[in-house]
Amino acid sequence: YHDQFADVLRLYFNRLDNILGQLVASMETIPVSIGGTNTDAFGRLRVSNPLTLFDSSHRYADNTLWVNSITGTAAATFNANEGLVDLTVGSASGDQIIRETIKVFSYQPGKSLLVMNTFIFGTAKANLRQRAGYYGAANGIYFEREGSINYMVERSSVTGSVVNTRVAQADWNQDPMDGTGPSGLTLDSSKAQILYMDIEWLGLGTVRTGFIINGAFVPCHNFNHANLINTTYITTASLPLRYEMTNAAATTGASTLKQVCSTVISEGGYELRGAQLSAGTPITTPKTLTTAGTFYPVVSLRLKTTRLDAIAILTAVSILGITNNANYKWEVVASGTTTGGTWVSAGTNSGVEYNITGTAFTVGTGRILATGFFQGSNQGSNSVDILKEALFTTQLERDPFTPTAYELTLACTAASNGDQVLGSVDWEEISR
C-alpha cells in the first residue's frame, strides 16, 4: 500500500509541476481605481443595502404625502393615465404652486444620503421658473430652470438670511451636459429626467448632483465645501422634498410641470440614536371612556409650531384596561383632531408637545396607522412595538405653509359605557 500511495503522490505532483510550468507570472502591480458614482458621498464602494427613508409615487391618486401652497390660478391635479401629478400655473404674474412633503427626512452623520426626483418640466418660456430637489424654504439643494437656462442651486440660511447660490449649466464643474462633457450627452430639461444628488453633510462635506440617463449616473456639478469655507454650508441636511413652479412675471400661456416619483435613501442603513421621551396618563387619573363605541384621546403628540422641521418618531405604546374583563380597542391615528385638554411641552430641548387631558377625538381625514384589541385585567399593560418594519411611518408630520403641526394620537374605545384605561407613548427625537 505504501508503494501504491507513493505512486499516486508522484503522479499528482508531476501534473502539478506541469500546470505550474504553463503559468506566466508577473511581478508588476496593476493599479485599480474604483470611484465616481460607484462610491457613495463618503467614498465607500456602493455595495451596502440602502435603507429607504421615503418614497413617493402616484398610482391611484394624489397621495397624502405632500401639501400644496397655491397662488392665483395654480393647481395640482392627479393624472390617472400617466400616474403622476400635473402642477399647473396660468399666465398671470405671481401664479405659483409649491409642493412639499409633510415629513422632513433624517440625515445621519457619516451616512451618505441619496435623493432622487423624477419629473418633466414644462416648456421653457420667459419669466417661468421651475424647480425640483431636496430643499425647503431656508436650506437645500435643487435643480432649477428659469426661462431657458438650467441651474444647480444651493440654498443656505447660515448667514441668517436665505441665500441661493446658482450655478448655471455652462459652469457645472463635472459635466455641462452640452455635448462637450465627459458623457457626451446634451441635457434636454423639457424631457423626462431623473435628478439625483448624494449628500456628504457633516456640516462641511460635498454635495454631488447629476442625472441618471441610460441607466447610468451622470455627475454634473459638485458643491465642495471642506477646506474652503469658514462655517457650515447649510443649517441642516435633514430636509423635505419640493417641487415648484412660479411665474416671476406674465408668461405666454399656461404651463405644466409633471411630478412623478421621489425617494430619499440612507446608504448603509440607519440607526435610531435620538433622545428617548415618553408621556402618559397619571396612575391616579385613568381616562374614562364615557360612551361605548366612541374613541377618546389617551395621549396626543404634535410638533411645536416653532420646530416644524424637527424629526420625532413614535416608537411604542402601552395601554392598560382598568375595568376587569372589559373589551377595548385602541388605534394610533395620524392627522386626527383632539378637542379640549392642554398641550404641554415635552421639555425645553424637545420639539414635541403632548396632550393627555383631551376630551374628544375625531379621525376626520386622518389615517389609522395601527390598531388592536385587548381586555381589562390585572395581568399588566399591553405594550406594542409600533415601529415594526417601517421605521419612519409614525414620524410626526406638518404643513409648512399654514403652518400647522399634525397630531399623532393613541385613541381608545370600550364596549361598555364608563370603562377606564391608562396609556402612555414613547417616542424618539432625532433632531435636537
Regions found by a protein language model. Give the residues of each.
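Extracellular glycan-recognition surfaces and repeat-rich motifs
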Residues: 61-82
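Localized edge beta-strand/strand-to-loop motifs within extracellular or lumenal beta-rich domains
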Residues: 190-206, 212
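Extracellular "spike/adhesin" assembly and maturation modules
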Residues: 1-30
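Secretory/extracellular carbohydrate-interaction modules
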Residues: 87-165, 302-305, 321-329, 335-344
